[in-house]
Amino acid sequence: AKDGYLVSKSTGCKYECFWLGKNEGCDKECKAPNQGGGYGYCHAFACWCENLPESTPTYPIPGKSCGKK
């Protein structure tokens, strides 16, 4: 397992959040079936996820820079 920032596969962007620390939205995203993580919270205004499967992509995705050229 690994820890990391959740990332949108289509854009390469982190999942933004504003409620730092315990964050229901991040936790829900982290535990979603397509992510498969164990616990999510908001760190530095992005969703950080623990105990992700190695197969789940985390930020940054090589070649996708979240809108930056």
UniProtKB/Swiss-Prot annotation:
GO MF annotations, alphabetized = sodium channel inhibitor activity; toxin activity
Gene Ontology cellular component? extracellular region
Q: Where in the cell is it found?
A: Secreted
Look up keyword Cytoplasm and say if it applies: no
Query: Which of the residues bear the PTM Cysteine amide?
Result: 66
Q: Which GO terms describe its biological process?
A: defense response
Task: Name the Pfam families on file.
Answer: Toxin_3
Disulfide-bonded cysteine pairs: these are: 13-66, 17-42, 26-47, 30-49
Q: Which residues form the LCN-type CS-alpha/beta domain?
A: 2-67
Show the propeptide residue ranges: 67-69
Presence of the UniProt keyword Secreted in the record: yes
Domains (record comment): Has the structural arrangement of an alpha-helix connected to antiparallel beta-sheets by disulfide bonds (CS-alpha/beta).
Protein family (similarity comment): Belongs to the long (4 C-C) scorpion toxin superfamily. Sodium channel inhibitor family. Beta subfamily.
List the protein's name.
Neurotoxin Cex5
- Native species: Centruroides exilicauda (Bark scorpion)
